[in-house]
Design a protein with these regions (language model features):
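Long compositionally biased, domain-poor regions of proteins
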Residues: 6-11, 16, 38, 128, ...
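Amphipathic alpha-helical segments
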Residues: 30-67, 71, 86, 228-266
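A short glycine-rich beta-alpha junction/loop motif
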Residues: 20-37, 173-181, 213-232
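Non-catalytic DNA-recognition/assembly elements of restriction-modification systems
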Residues: 80-101, 261, 272
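A short beta-sheet element
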Residues: 1-6, 120-121, 137-147, 151-201
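Intrinsic low-complexity tandem-repeat regions in disordered proteins
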Residues: 2, 9, 45, 67-70, ...
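Sequence-specific dsDNA recognition surfaces
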Residues: 94-107, 122-151
Length: 287
């Protein structure tokens, strides 16, 4: 019965009507017909469809397992708490910090024909954590204060969707949900940019655990500025980056392949479900 109703879902949804939030009326689906083949046939169909469902669930579990493995090893490599060969500063010692902002939407001169990337959380969701261009752009007239965020700096979500970051590979700006962090000139030669990128995952987690939840959620910026920041030897930073780059490449390869396999299995499942749950009426099969 479950598989039968799942197969009828589209037809059921097509009866939705009403103002506001459309919904399905029982009276509209009372006359929907459900085939009742012999119980042994039902059992065989369920066995086949259960097999397809199980295969899809196994693939999804494997994908989730690979992601957890990557996070585990990344966190292990970035944990310096027991290391005596690492110098420690604070986030405030390491970075210059600036707030993002949104130019007035009512002023067309700030937006029309703009070519300057202006990042929002949507850009990270759509294009990942290394950003070279944005969905929306502003003009130079929309830029104020100290100018653009420089290439090879970072944006960190410090309000709303807290604990997300990205590396900017071009001069740009971001909205007020982000704080821009630029490595201080005195530390440029002591920090590998990709190591800093990976260590932002630790900062992300710190932000999620140090936020003001009253009203509009935002990061406790005083706590963030005081957060300890490790400076391992440059050679060690590059070793960690090499390991994480390889692990990430492998994970991404699997993450790209497994969803495709899941989609293929789902299509296969839907094909056989439709075939197995399509029955001729008795009068159609009568001699």
């Amino acid at each position: 019965l479950y598989y039968c109703l799942t197969n009828m879902q589209e037809a059921i949804y097509s009866t939705k009507k009403g103002g506001g939030v459309p919904h399905v009326h029982i009276s509209d689906i009372d006359n929907f017909e459900i085939p009742v083949p012999p119980v042994d046939v039902q059992s065989k169909i369920v066995e086949i469809l259960d097999c397809f469902s199980s295969l899809e669930a196994e693939l999804e579990a494997e994908l989730e397992k690979r992601k957890r493995q990557y996070v585990y090893y990344r966190d292990m490599l970035l944990n310096f708490s027991d290391r005596k060969d690492v110098d420690w500063l604070t986030v405030n010692d390491v970075f210059e910090m600036r707030n993002g902002y949104t130019p007035s939407k009512s002023n067309r001169q700030f937006w029309e024909g703009g070519t300057i990337p202006w990042f929002r959380m949507d850009d990270i969701r759509a294009n990942g954590r290394i950003l070279s261009d944005s969905i929306l752009h502003i003009t130079d007239k929309g830029v104020k204060g100290k100018g653009l965020f420089e290439a090879n700096t970072f944006i960190l979500a410090t309000s709303a969707t807290i604990g997300e970051h990205a590396l900017l590979t071009t001069d740009s700006l971001a909205n007020q949900r982000f704080t821009n962090l630029k490595i201080k000139e005195t530390l440029i030669q002591k920090l590998d940019l990709k190591f800093v990128f990976y260590y932002f995952f630790v900062i992300d987690d710190f932000c999620k655990h140090h936020s003001n939840k009253s009203g509009f959620e935002s990061v406790d910026m005083d706590a963030l500025r005081k957060m300890p920041y490790p400076i391992p030897a440059l050679e060690e930073q590059r070793r960690i980056v090499g390991v994480l780059d390889k692990f990430e490449s492998l994970t991404e390869s699997l993450a790209a392949g497994l969803p495709a396999e899941i989609i293929a299995r789902r299509k296969q499942y839907e094909y056989y479900r439709d075939k197995l749950l399509t029955f001729k009426r008795k009068e159609e099969t009568a001699p």
